[in-house]
């Protein structure tokens, strides 16, 4: 009797299907990386600037400061759709000129440098002013940069963030629930916070709060129908900021003497265990966000030129971020605040210039 041939029920994928699955997995990792970056940068500015300087008014100033970034993201999505480009950089190439695509990449690099310097300053202040370690700020900045460079793997960092997304989310929800148990509606008064003049000044200085949203325009389109994009980190940021406002009276929120006090003051009302977890999570989040700035900045530098080995770019970018730390944290914070109101102006000009080119590109394709 002839034996039946061996049969397998394992599904055999083609090479193209396997490649598509890998690309989708890499895209999900990059999306998780951007979501963490967006949340950490927004909550850092929200606590250290909005809540510390205007108190209860931060509950409505936060969404207002996100609007310019959201508008530019919508404009970028429109240009991508008109040019049928997978990323905004490709939309610049198709709608205008490859040279302007390089200008857009250079603009993104400068934004990442500014944010990286801001995150590095936050980390240094957190250790030297908050935890009170007997280390000079410059050496603390050097140690922080070395730790961030150890995390800067081209594909390893996004995958690490993807693996940590649920533990970090659980931690954030735990802290949010703890803050909400201390919430009091009376702390919403006065809703104008420190006054209209302070609120107007804060809006003008924090109008670039949502600039990391522009990075989502560089994500290639996914296969899923329901793409939430930056919505989850923005919702979580607004919930955390609202919970901090409801847990702190305006008079107490505005007593922060330095950056570390402003970042750590909302943790005072947490339980001791949650306070420790919040401090650890805060440091991990800032370190990962700094590493993301370094990794993405290096990727843009390599994209502007020939694909040389990445380590010289990492070293050069680290030196670029470390050099301003010699000026002192207070002077550096003042310089960063002077630049912040103008961060979105070049991006808005470039996107407005792209719109007519994108419309012409669509007409050429439909003709």
List where the protein language model places each region.
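Transmembrane helix-boundary motif of multi-pass solute transporters/channels
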Residues: 3-89, 217-221, 231, 255-263
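Hydrophobic, membrane-embedded alpha-helices of multi-pass small-molecule transporters
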Residues: 26-51, 64-68, 108-112, 140, ...
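Hydrophobic alpha-helical segments and their helix-loop junctions in multi-pass secondary transporters
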Residues: 30, 116-120, 167-193, 351-366
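Membrane helical hairpin/interfacial module
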Residues: 44-138, 144
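Selective recognition of specific alpha-helical transmembrane segments in multi-pass small-molecule
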Residues: 64-77, 109-119, 144-150, 166-180, ...
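Membrane-interface loop-to-helix entry segments
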Residues: 123, 137-140, 149-180, 340-352
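Membrane-water interface regions at transmembrane-helix termini and the short interhelical loops
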Residues: 125-128, 144-164, 219-224, 331-335
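Membrane-interface interhelical connector segments
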Residues: 247-275
